[in-house]
Every structure is written in C-alpha cells, then in structure tokens.
C-alpha cells in the first residue's frame, strides 16, 4: 500500500481524527512532509477510543520490542 493509499484509507474511516506518525526506531514523531518516498513498512494502529491514529514506521517487531 502506498502512502497516498494509507492517507485515503485513514481519511475515509476516520475523518475527524488526527494522524500521528511515529518512527519505531527513534520513537519520535515524523511529519507528513518528512516521510521517505518508499513507505513499504508501516504498521497502522487505530484505537477506537482515542482521537488519534498512529502510523509506526518500521515493522511490528520493532514497535513491540523497543
């Protein structure tokens, strides 16, 4: 899935939520403008009771174990 497809998916299902992008290796927030072109490893976290959507750059193992 491309970054644009992710953005469309997020907006379609959660138009009123803020999207937060976190680099799983550094645990720091990344802005949309600073994302690399090739986003082939994104883990999407949507929590029903929160007002934000979190995209983690990196695979699930990195997110869970760092």
Question: For the regions a protein language model found, what residue spans apply to each?
Answer:
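N-terminal acidic leader/helix
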Residues: 2-23
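Detector for methionine-enriched segments
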Residues: 1, 7-8, 39, 61
């Amino acid at each position: 899935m491309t970054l644009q497809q992710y953005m469309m998916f997020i907006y379609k299902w959660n138009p009123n939520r803020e999207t937060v992008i976190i680099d799983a290796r550094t645990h720091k927030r990344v802005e949309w403008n600073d994302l690399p072109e090739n986003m082939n490893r994104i883990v999407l976290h949507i929590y029903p009771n929160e007002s934000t959507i979190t995209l983690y750059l990196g695979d699930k193992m990195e997110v869970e174990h760092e």
